[in-house]
Amino acid sequence: MTWSDILAEEKQQPYFKQILDFLACESANGKVIFPAKENIFNAFKYTELDNLKVVILGQDPYHNYNQAHGLAFSVQKGVDIPPSLQNIYKELARSIPEFKIPNHGYLVDWAKQGVFLLNTTLTVEAHKANSHKDIGWETFTDTVISKISENKHNVVFMLWGSHARKKKVLIDSSRHLILESTHPSPLSAHRGFLGCNHFVDCNKYLIEKKSQKIDWNLLC
């Protein structure tokens, strides 16, 4: 099974057509939607299903200009690193001595190694967080999470915060490793995310399962 198989099947479903109709209508009415149309499915572009080793779930895309480009927590180069990603870098630096905090938040290197950076809602209206949370995207992304669980083995799922942790019911814990903590947001990072050791535990598990570990360092 490939992403193309899953997308082809879901695109035939009424809910998916409603999503596309909604986005087209909003754009026609002058609404600005992020990420750009060609970037909405970038998580699927950069991480092939065959190569997928890790899933990190986000909620919805960044809602300011020049930030979102289709990968959860990632921003385009030349943009300030968002606070949640700064805390992700802090945890990496705390737990992995050789990790060097980069000067950007562009996470494509992770995605190409098999880290699937999936927002559960794939679009957002400019400057309106969670504005597209009820248009049907979660039906699609829940299906994607379930398909990964059913068709893969030994995937590491990182579930940060209450929204992501609700997706635990979609994952077969007998086939995969589920790592849970609070969200890396400044509001909650100190209540469990900082110190969680997820990136170390992830690589230990991948090595145990005879898989290539993730190099969390990002080229500057």
Curated annotation (Swiss-Prot):
Its EC number is 3.2.2.27. One of its GO terms (biological process) is base-excision repair, AP site formation via deaminated base removal. SMART domains: UDG, UreE_C. GO terms for cellular component: cytoplasm. It catalyses: Hydrolyzes single-stranded DNA or mismatched double-stranded DNA and polynucleotides, releasing free uracil. CDD domains: UDG-F1-like. The active site is at D60 (proton acceptor). PROSITE patterns: U_DNA_GLYCOSYLASE (PS00130). It is found in: Cytoplasm. Keywords: Cytoplasm, DNA damage, DNA repair, Hydrolase. One of its GO terms (molecular function) is uracil DNA N-glycosylase activity. Pfam families: UDG. Coiled coil: none annotated. Belongs to the uracil-DNA glycosylase (UDG) superfamily. UNG family. Excises uracil residues from the DNA which can arise as a result of misincorporation of dUMP residues by DNA polymerase or due to deamination of cytosine. HAMAP family: UDG (MF_00148). This is Uracil-DNA glycosylase. It comes from Francisella tularensis subsp. novicida (strain U112).
